[in-house]
Amino acid sequence: MAWYWWRRRRRRGWWKPRRRRWRRRRARRRGPARRHRARRRIVRHPCNGQTSSGNRVPRSVQAVDPKYVSLQLVWHSWDFRRGLFGQAGIKRMQQESDALTLSPVHRPKRPKRDTQVKEKTPEKDSDSAVQLRRLQPWIHSSQETKDEEEEIPEGPVQEQLLQQLQQQRLLRVQLESIAQEVLKIRRGHSLHPLLSSHA
């Protein structure tokens, strides 16, 4: 019967307050707030310190156009006063920036894909045929012979057919150039012609 009573008291938790008292006594013996003390660490400056592993600081990247790096376009130590830019420095920078914008040294480069084929109006039949051959280098010799065979009929009918052929070829070249421009606009390589005309 005695052991059963002891188990009942143990289940209720009669030993817990004694444990708490023991913890309090232990903390008093150790001293005031020992577990909350922060460890002291020596923090060294990474740039000044010389370590065996070498310099860990990455090198600075030059992200400035060397064309604009000159004595007039650089802020000097005497341009700052109490952490702000001085009036003389601001005036100098404004004058130099205006001079650069008004008289650009180099023309802006055009991308290679923006080149357009210059189309000239054909004055003669022979000139237009040579021009079409230059514009269409992918035509095989077999196709050229077929075109020549088609141009065999004589008289005014032959001239009309030749004119129609030239018009069709020019239309084909124009349509191909328009399709290429549309593809460039879709890919984002060039501006829309309406937008470029307004700008």
Swiss-Prot record:
Residues 96-155 are annotated as: Disordered. Residues 113-127 have a biased composition (Basic and acidic residues). This is ORF1/1 protein. It comes from Torque teno virus (isolate Human/Finland/Hel32/2002).
